[in-house]
Regions:
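Bulky hydrophobic segments
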Residues: 1-323, 332-399
Length: 399
């Protein structure tokens, strides 16, 4: 009885610690970005605040990676991979919906990441309100006379505006790729109409219209209405590879290393997604801004990693699927063992191997992509600066 009470007490403290960790991480992330370059306008301030949330996600996944390797090599149990209990607060909150007991081994890890990210998100929301109150002058909107347009005129104007943005942001290849993917996804949905997987396939099909829908719904001048249309190519790529090629064409089973390839690609796509979001708020017109954009792109990728694993956990929890691969038992020929060895032969970690394998693959491609983004931004800035200098020199000579 005393042992159960002690375990419950430790569990409650762990919940509090993880949440506070998310709060502190978000605050430090915001202060760090402000230190690199103090925000001069509301867009830069917004980016710095959102960066705090991304730092919370990065801290969540990096701590879990650290605990995994300590357990892997030392044979400890920091991740509580043997936790199998129906008394957990998550079960009390939503019930034991899952049908696969193997998922319970990932419960503590996903709980920690969820609480840390939740702390970061709540802190970010509070900071958004706080900085808006503190910096009222930055958020004063210039009132413009609004012309009263009929729905037809408004729709015509909106269509022409969005068409111009689309053609500016994207190439013919991007647009062709979108529609080809939508066509094959629609065909797959029709074929799978009576299967449970059809719901997920339909959701992924809708996701290929995400950026377009965002531009239509949100008014001109808002943050969401300025997101680069090329971000839709990133979403469509991951949907095409994961949902259509992986699940419908069944490449997960046909091609042995397809999952490895997909997670390597996801690291690149997440960095580029963060890059396009940052460009919506900050112009790459200085070296400090290049650092800010690159830092946000990296943090965004590290935020998506735990968020993705949590979404897989919730999906497995509700529908009894096996997205997190907790059934996987590694062999001596496993790529993970070839790279890191067998460690302390900690068999309780086996259900967690697939999750950390996926995360590590994404990290591998995130780092070089971040370096590429920074180098390309600085080279563009230097090129623009040299062009401006040569223009000034020509004007001086003429004078």
């Amino acid at each position: 009885m005393e042992t159960q009470q002690l375990s419950a007490g430790i569990g409650e403290w762990d919940i509090l610690i993880q949440f506070v960790l998310g709060v502190v991480s978000a605050l430090l992330g915001y202060l760090f970005m402000q230190k690199i370059r103090k925000a001069q306008n509301k867009n830069e301030l917004t980016l710095n605040v959102i960066s705090g949330m991304c730092v919370a996600g990065a801290v969540a996944i990096l701590i879990e990676i650290g605990e995994f390797f300590i357990d892997f090599y030392k044979g400890t149990n920091l991740l509580h991979a043997d936790l199998v209990t129906n008394d957990h607060w998550l079960y009390r909150l939503v019930g034991t919906a899952m049908s696969l007991d193997g998922q319970r081994y990932l419960l503590d890890m996903d709980e920690d990441m969820l609480l840390t990210i939740l702390g970061g998100i709540i802190t970010t929301a509070v900071m958004c309100i706080a900085v808006r109150i503190k910096n009222k002058n930055m958020f004063v909107r210039v009132k413009k006379e609004k012309l009263k347009l009929s729905f037809g005129k408004w729709a015509e104007k909106k269509f022409s505006t969005e068409k111009a943005k689309l053609l500016k942001d994207c190439s013919a290849f991007d647009i062709t790729f979108w529609w080809c993917t939508r066509a094959v996804m629609l065909y797959a949905f029709i074929v799978w109409e009576n299967r449970p997987e059809a719901i997920l396939l339909c959701a992924n099909l809708i996701a290929t219209f995400a950026i377009t829908l965002i531009h239509i719904v949100f008014p001109e001048g808002t943050f969401f209405s300025r997101v680069n249309y090329r971000a839709q190519t990133l979403i469509t790529t991951i949907v095409f590879l994961g949902s259509y090629c992986g699940n419908y064409v069944w490449l997960y089973n046909i091609v042995p290393r397809f999952d490895l390839f997909l997670h390597l690609v996801s690291g690149v796509l997440c960095v580029m997604g963060g890059y396009y979001i940052a460009l919506t708020l900050v112009k790459p017109d200085s070296k400090k801004n290049a650092i800010i954009i690159t830092a946000f792109a990296a943090l965004f990728s590290f935020f998506i990693m735990p968020a993705w694993e949590i979404s897989e956990f919730i999906g497995d929890f509700i529908w009894g699927t096996t997205n997190q691969g907790f059934y996987w038992g590694p062999s001596d020929s496993s790529f993970l063992f070839k790279v890191f060895g067998r460690g302390a032969y900690n068999t309780t970690l086996y259900p967690l191997y697939d999750t950390f394998y996926d995360v590590l693959l994404a990290v591998v491609t995130t780092i070089p992509t971040v370096v590429y983004v920074y180098l390309s931004l600085t080279s563009e800035f230097k090129k623009g600066k040299s062009l401006a200098q040569s223009k000034e020199e020509k004007e001086t000579v003429i004078c």
